[in-house]
């Protein structure tokens, strides 16, 4: 009987060995759980601004924010932006702007983004110019100061210590970047040729990477970095450069090619950075493709008039007067208001997207299909 038991046991040894081998060979990314980011830190321009520029200067006028918040919150949309949907996907609150000193809660992160921000240091800034003084380098400096101050507040204790991130959140958080659009726009409206704007891209990307490195050196490890969208589909470009050659869908072809070149160089630089920063999980997020698909097949998503801004007044693209601004026509004050149903439009104000469009783009980048490496949002803490 003992002999037979030994025979039976020996028959099972190969199977046990096989199971152990399979478990050992399986890549860790498939064996581990989804990322549970306790906080988000955001850097960039208007696409991810939740009120930074508004805190420093003034909020965009009504009807900005009308769809979801029913008031202007400093977001450049009729409602929520992609960053809001990302936060909610992790059951985190909407991010408070770093610059907002009243009513802010930084327990689960902070937003350093500011509408009108650039990667390169701008020459013409608000209030006299059009660009934000809070370039990416300034946002990095603000983040560095934020870390320093949270340590001080944490040591002091008290009620304010309950409104800041825990110390280990900085290394466990998701770091989101969405910037670069304004660097390209400066060239377009600065009378540069397409070739001249393209020539500035390598320098812009190099500065981008340097700032990402700086933030990595402060403890950031999980990076979710958006490329830029199709600039040539924006009504503000179509209206100001009417002679631009259009593609078959109506977008300004050469301006989109600049966006694609920027994305190519950024993706290339991030691949190199990924190989150099062994502790970092760096995901390049292709925003261009899902945004462009809205213009190539608007009916699929329930949109109409893809190149006409929902909020504005006058002209072919409804941006003769900016959203929320007013104009006197024959003694009558006309306020540039919202279209009847923003959920049927892609573009909100000539530049920025509606909440409806933002939600669709979010749902597509969420899966990782458009990302490099192809990692979904809930796996963005892992290297692949």
From Swiss-Prot:
Keywords, sorted A to Z: Glycoprotein, Glycosidase, Hydrolase, Lipid degradation, Lipid metabolism, Nodulation, Signal
Induction: Accumulates within 5 days in response to Sinorhizobium meliloti inoculation leading to nodulation. Repressed in nodules exposed to nitrate.
Highest taxon in the source lineage: Eukaryota
Positions bearing carbohydrate: 105, 191, 198, 276, 330
Classification via InterPro entries: GDSL (IPR001087), SGNH_hydro_sf (IPR036514), SGNH_plant_lipase-like (IPR035669)
Enzyme Commission no: 3.1.1.-
UniProt GO BP: lipid catabolic process; nodulation
Cellular component, GO, one term: symbiosome
Residues making up the signal peptide according to the UniProt record: 1-31
Active site: 46 (nucleophile), 349, 352
Compartment annotation: Symbiosome
GO terms, molecular function: alpha-L-fucosidase activity; hydrolase activity, acting on ester bonds
EC top class named in words: hydrolase
Tissue: Expressed in root nodules (at protein level).
PANTHER family, alphabetized: GDSL ESTERASE_LIPASE ENOD8, ZINC FINGER FYVE DOMAIN CONTAINING PROTEIN
Protein family (similarity comment): Belongs to the 'GDSL' lipolytic enzyme family.
Function: Has lipase and esterase activities. Probably involved in root nodule physiology.
Name by which UniProt lists this protein: GDSL esterase/lipase ENOD8
């Amino acid at each position: 009987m003992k002999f037979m038991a030994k025979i039976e046991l020996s028959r099972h040894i190969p199977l046990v060995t096989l199971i152990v081998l399979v478990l050992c060979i399986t890549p860790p990314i498939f064996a581990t759980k989804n990322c549970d980011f306790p906080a988000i830190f955001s850097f960039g321009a208007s696409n991810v601004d939740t009120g930074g520029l508004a805190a420093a200067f003034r909020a965009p006028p009504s009807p900005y924010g009308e769809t979801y918040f029913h008031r202007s919150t400093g977001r450049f949309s009729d409602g929520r932006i992609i960053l809001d949907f990302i936060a909610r996907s992790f059951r985190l609150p909407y991010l408070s702007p770093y610059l907002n000193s009243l009513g802010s809660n930084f327990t689960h992160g902070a937003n350093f983004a500011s509408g009108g921000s650039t990667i390169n240091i701008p020459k013409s800034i608000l209030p006299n110019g059009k660009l934000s003084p809070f370039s990416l380098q300034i946002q990095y400096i603000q983040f560095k100061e934020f870390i320093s101050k949270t340590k001080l507040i944490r040591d002091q204790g008290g009620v304010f210590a309950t409104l800041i991130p825990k110390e280990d959140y900085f290394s466990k958080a998701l770091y989101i970047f969405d910037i670069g659009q304004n660097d390209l726009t400066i060239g377009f409206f600065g009378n540069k040729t397409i070739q001249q704007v393209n020539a500035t891209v390598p320098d812009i990307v190099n500065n981008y990477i340097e700032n990402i490195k700086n933030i990595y050196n402060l403890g950031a490890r999980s990076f979710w970095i958006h490329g830029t969208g199709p600039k040539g589909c924006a009504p503000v470009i179509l209206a100001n450069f009417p002679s631009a050659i259009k593609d078959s869908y109506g977008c300004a072809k050469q301006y989109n090619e600049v966006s694609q070149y920027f994305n190519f160089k950024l993706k290339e630089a991030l691949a190199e950075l990924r190989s150099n920063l062994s502790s970092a999980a760096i995901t390049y997020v292709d925003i261009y493709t899902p945004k462009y698909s809205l213009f190539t097949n608007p009916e699929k998503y329930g949109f109409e008039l893809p190149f006409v801004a929902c909020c504005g007044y006058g002209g072919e693209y409804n941006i003769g007067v900016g959203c929320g601004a007013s104009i006197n026509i024959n003694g009558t004050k006309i306020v540039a208001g919202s279209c009847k149903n923003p959920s049927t439009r892609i573009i909100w104000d000539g530049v920025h997207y509606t909440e409806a469009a933002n939600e669709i783009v979010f749902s597509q980048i969420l899966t990782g299909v458009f990302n490099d490496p192809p990692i979904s949002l809930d796996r963005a803490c892992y290297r692949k």
